[in-house]
């Protein structure tokens, strides 16, 4: 019974400001409890359950703020469990709503940087939307996204490992010509041991399909793969990272210079995204944890 009263109390507290919010009488009727019983329950001294609930709210708010207000209720719930807390994801959802904790939201507009090179030769799609891999360095994806600064556009190129979802290569510059993506893939090659048949997948942008970049990949022993023109799903993993960095960092930060943008994005990638941000596709682990688990298995073998 007390759970129903707690639900009514929480719902009324979070919706009473709205003109169309249900009344206490309506909610009591829906849940099959009496109005008098609800108010009698509400007037009792604070119970141990209520104290635990308030403590849980404090923990949830602390986790939400510690993670830069990026997490929805599922990630907050997983972070709570990892820290030894106990609560259902639905309880976390309800308490976050009561506390008014809303994660940062994406903006609808997106500028495309894909400019197809009409002179590019045929390059196969070796990935076919399968963004999984058995070991780090086997399959990688990359893309470029833009970052506004007071000095004009900055451009971020990334390389993501499909096995760990870790950003293993990145570069920021004031243009998105081929040297930008070359820097990113060279960093990636330094950060992981590439498989003998390693694949790098991208869209059909003119820089990715250029002869200059093809020569770089060939020199690193990497097979090239590209998706179809105009299909974001063919490079969905890279697009997903772009959305995350935009929502969680770029859209919430003002960059006076390209240098400041580079420094801030570097911190996000190396300290936040790779090492502390829980990834749903990894069972709510971090990319670095998955990478380290692979290395530990290799050492034990």
Regions found by a protein language model. Give the residues of each.
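Charged DNA-binding/catalytic regions of mobile-element recombinases
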Residues: 1-301
């Amino acid at each position: 019974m007390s759970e129903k009263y707690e639900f009514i109390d929480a719902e009324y507290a979070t919706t009473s400001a709205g003109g169309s919010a249900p009344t206490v009488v309506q909610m009591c009727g829906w849940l099959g409890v009496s109005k008098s019983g609800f108010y009698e329950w509400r007037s009792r001294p604070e119970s141990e359950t209520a104290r635990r609930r308030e403590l849980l709210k404090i923990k949830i708010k602390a986790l939400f703020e510690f993670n830069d207000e990026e997490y929805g209720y599922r990630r907050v719930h997983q972070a709570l469990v990892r820290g030894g807390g106990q609560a259902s994801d639905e309880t976390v959802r309800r308490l976050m709503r009561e506390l008014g904790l809303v994660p940062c939201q994406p903006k609808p507009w997106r500028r495309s940087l894909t400019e197809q090179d009409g002179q590019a030769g045929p390059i196969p799609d070796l990935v076919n939307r399968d963004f999984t891999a058995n070991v780090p360095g086997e399959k990688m994806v990359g893309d470029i996204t833009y970052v506004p600064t007071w000095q004009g556009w900055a451009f971020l190129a990334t390389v993501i490992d499909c096995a760990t979802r870790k950003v293993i290569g990145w570069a920021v510059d004031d243009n998105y010509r081929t040297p930008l993506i070359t820097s990113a893939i060279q960093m990636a090659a330094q950060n992981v041991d590439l498989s003998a048949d390693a694949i790098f997948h991208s869209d059909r942008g003119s820089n990715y399909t250029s002869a200059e970049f093809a020569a770089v990949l060939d020199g690193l022993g990497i097979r090239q793969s590209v998706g179809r023109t105009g299909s974001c799903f063919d490079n969905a993993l890279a697009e997903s990272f772009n959305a995350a960095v935009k929502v969680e960092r770029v859209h919430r930060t003002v960059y006076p210079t390209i240098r400041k943008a580079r420094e801030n994005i570097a911190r996000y990638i190396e300290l936040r995204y790779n090492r502390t941000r829980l990834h749903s596709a990894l069972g709510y682990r971090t990319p670095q944890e998955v990478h380290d688990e692979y290395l530990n298995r290799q050492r034990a073998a």
